UniProtKB/Swiss-Prot annotation:
Pfam families: Transposase_31. PANTHER family: INACTIVE RECOMBINATION-PROMOTING NUCLEASE-LIKE PROTEIN RPNE-RELATED, PTHR34611. The lineage of its organism: Bacteria, Pseudomonadati, Pseudomonadota, Gammaproteobacteria, Enterobacterales. This is Putative inactive recombination-promoting nuclease-like protein YjiP. InterPro entries: Rpn/YhgA-like_nuclease, RpnA, Transposase_31.
């Protein structure tokens, strides 16, 4: 089993579970909007390297990147796990920064 370094044990637990294809597929079947589920072939999920995320960002969150076949071609599903113990008025900007790192 892969060991992950994270600031909270909750992040490590979710990241460990969501790096398993069957668990990730079940999670996405439950949580992705129907329109997106219908576009994606979740049986084609492939775990990708998240090494593109710089060390400063890596210290702030746990991230998982899955590639997936879609009706339109290849695509990606980026899972960001962020447990907050208090309100963060800048959360939307932080999530945007994480997403931009993937691009």
């Amino acid at each position: 089993m892969t060991n992950f370094t994270t600031s909270t044990p909750h992040d490590a637990l979710f990241k460990t579970f969501l790096t398993h294809p069957d668990t990730a597929r079940d999670f996405m079947e439950i949580h992705l909007p129907k329109d997106l589920r219908e576009l994606c072939d979740l049986d084609s999920l492939k775990l990708e390297s998240a090494s593109f995320v710089d060390e400063k960002l890596r210290a702030l969150h746990s991230d998982i990147l899955w590639s997936v076949k879609t009706r339109e071609g290849d695509g990606y599903i980026y899972v960001v796990i962020e447990h907050q113990s208090r309100e963060d008025i800048h959360m939307a900007f932080r999530l945007m920064r994480y997403s931009m790192a993937v691009m």
